[in-house]
Each structure stands twice: as C-alpha cells, then as structure tokens.
Amino acid sequence: MNDNKILVVNAGSSSIKFQLFDYHKKVLAKALCERIFVDGFFKLEFNEQKVEEKVAFPDHHAAVTHFLNTLKKHKIIQELSDIILVGHRVVQGANYFKDSVIVDAEALAKIKEFIKLAPLHNKPEADVIEIFFKEVPSAKNVAVFDTTFHTTIPQENYLYAVPRSWEQKHLVRRYGFHGTSYKFINNYLEKHLNKQNLNLIVCHLGNGASVCAIKNGKSFNTSMGFTPLEGLIMGTRSGDLDPAIIGYVAEQENMSASDVVNALNKKSGMLALTGASDMRDVFAKPQENAVAIKMYVNRVADYIAKYLNQLEGNIDGLVFTGGIGENASDCVELFINAVKSLGFATDLKLFVKYGDSCVVSTPQSKYKIYRVRTNEELMIVEDSIRLTQK
C-alpha cells in the first residue's frame, strides 16, 4: 500500500493541472501542462525541486504522456501501476450525478452527453479520462463534479422563469459550480466546530467567483447558474446582467450570440471595468478603480444579504475562501463592511497570518466570520478513496 499513489487531474481546454498524492494524502508532486495546441510549457514541483521546460504539446494526449514519463524519469513513481486512482475534476454533471462516480462506459457516455452544457470543460475532461484508460489501465478513474454538491438546491431556487420545455428538452436550469470547494469548506467546518448540519454563507472568491447558501449541510442556493457566467462580477466575466443585452449587442455589432457570450465570459468583468483581471492589480490603483471596486463589493454584499434572508438569519458563519477570500485582507474587509448593517463586524487586526483557517469576526459581530483555505484537490482524493473502499 505504501507505493500506491492517487493522481488528481484538472483538464481545461488548453491546459492540464496535476497533483500526485500518496495514500496518506500527502502531496508528492504538482505539475502543469499549458499552452496545449500552441507551443507548450511544462512545470513540475516535487521534493523542493522545480522543473520548467518548453515542450510541444500537439494535444492533451501528448501532455499526459509527457507528465507520466517525467514522473518516472525523476523516480517520483517507479511504474505507472503505482498510480491506483485517478480523480478527475469534471465541471458539468448536470442533475444526473448526485455523487462522485467511478468512471465506467456508462458514466463516460453521460459526461460526453453533457459536453453541450459545458463544451470548454467537459470535452477535454472526457478526452483525458479516456487517455488515462489507455495509459494507466490498472488505475480506477473517479469523476468528481463541480455540480454535484448543488443537486440538493430546491426547485424554487434552480428553476428559471422561462418556458418549461427549455428545461425538459435542453436542461436549462441553475446548476451552480465550485461545488467541490463548498463541500470541502462544509466538511472542514463540521469537524472544526464539532457540529453537523451547518448553515453557512460561503464566498468562493478567485478569478472565478460565486457565493453559496448552505442549509443543514446541503447546498440551498448559489450565485452561478446554468453556466459560471451568472452571479458575481469576476475577473473576466460580467456576472448578472439584462439578457436582452446579448441580442441587442449582437445586432448592433454584427456579432453572433455566441460571440457576445464569449465576450461576456472572457472580455468583461474587472478586465472591462479596469483593464486588469487580477484583483491584486485592481487594488493597486484604488482611486483610479474606485467605481469598479464598489461595483464588485456591492455585488458580493447583495448575495450575502440575499442568502442571509433565505436562511432566515440563522447561520453558523460567513466564510471567505478562494484566492481572494483567503489572501486579500483589504478586499475581505470591504465585503464585511458592506454588510455591517446586517450585524457583521470585523477588525483588520484579526487578519493575521494563519494556517488552514481563522476567525475574523469581532466579539460584537452578530455572526461568526471565517477565512478558510479551500483544498479541492484533497476533496477529490477523499472522494476517490471513499468510492473505491465501498
């Protein structure tokens, strides 16, 4: 058992992230293959060593085989059969997958069926699963879905007020994303607080960002919708807007609807408002970007207030996680101050260096406020072990 390894894979349209764990859940190596289809770049970190090299990756298969060969070359693994589990992050499982799943032909067919809902994500994820079937045939492959945690959202929160045939024929409804992160946060705080069935409002804030209302330990509502475009203002995504804008701009600019949606996904958000998609760059110019920062903060505050109301004011905590939520103290302070009328209170002195979590609410705060470091890869490892030990 000591030689057994678990690999976590996150495949995107032009990149693949890898993390290799031992069976005690310790990280052995991290790697990134990026610029697939273009010129290719490979990064590997292991045992306090770093490898960076330009490598041509004509496709995802070439990237996977290069990664596996590099693991053997540096003796991180002896044989490919050392990898007994491969956990794949899959973005879209629709409402079909209520749990993570050991991937067989039927599960793979379903993942492919949902490519139409998330073409940029599910297609490379399905392709990479098939690559691992071929390259590491002895390993079991587990799919862990961003959407699974949100399959508990009640109908009144997942339906859109559109013709019902759109849902019945085309699966148009709220799905929500970042579910693996929300599951990790919920599980972590259950252990940390020694309490089950928590009510939480969790803000996962990174370049992609969302908020989730957790009721009795289950997702009750979330800001992302049919796609990750809905909800908060993000690095390059617009978040909520009037859908009539899509048709109007398509007509005025002689663009297709999909071109407009692409612009809303990749050329909007903070990038459109400030010229920068990274919040560190935005906050480096607070006066110049004051309006954009106010818009960004207000949108997060709106969702916190909305979900506090939906949870009837009964929460065990407000949680900030993700790259911004975990690290940008000035940003988190703004979010909390924007909802201080609801009883939330913080003090910058509480924003000290911390390990996995810290409390940033003052004794005067009506509700506890936490910062918790999420770990989606560890959640995927734990799900993979759980399923294969059944």
Swiss-Prot record:
One of the GO biological process terms: acetyl-CoA biosynthetic process
InterPro entries linked to this entry: Ac/propionate_kinase (IPR004372), Aliphatic_acid_kin_short-chain (IPR000890), Aliphatic_acid_kinase_CS (IPR023865), ATPase_NBD (IPR043129)
Signal peptide: none
Enzyme class: transferase
EC annotation from Swiss-Prot or TrEMBL: 2.7.2.1
Catalytic activities: acetate + ATP = acetyl phosphate + ADP
Binding site for substrate: R89
Site residues by UniProt (Transition state stabilizer): H178, R237
Binding site for Mg(2+): N10, E376
Annotated GO MF terms: acetate kinase activity; ATP binding; magnesium ion binding
TM region(s), chain numbering: none
Compartments, record wording: Cytoplasm
Keyword Metal-binding annotated: yes
Cofactor note: Mg(2+). Can also accept Mn(2+).
Predominant cellular place of this UniProt entry's protein: cytoplasm
Cofactor(s) essential for the protein: Mg(2+); Mn(2+)
The organism's place on the tree of life at top rank: Bacteria
Binding site for ATP: K17, H204, L205, G206, N207, G208, D278, M279, R280, G323, I324, G325, E326, N327
Keywords, alphabetical: ATP-binding, Cytoplasm, Kinase, Magnesium, Metal-binding, Nucleotide-binding, Transferase
Catalytic residues (UniProt): D146
GO cellular component: a single term: cytosol
Function: Catalyzes the formation of acetyl phosphate from acetate and ATP. Can also catalyze the reverse reaction.
Assembly notes: Homodimer.
Family note: Belongs to the acetokinase family.
Identification of the protein by name: Acetate kinase
Taxonomy of the source species: Bacteria, Bacillati, Mycoplasmatota, Mycoplasmoidales, Mycoplasmoidaceae
Gene giving rise to this polypeptide: ackA
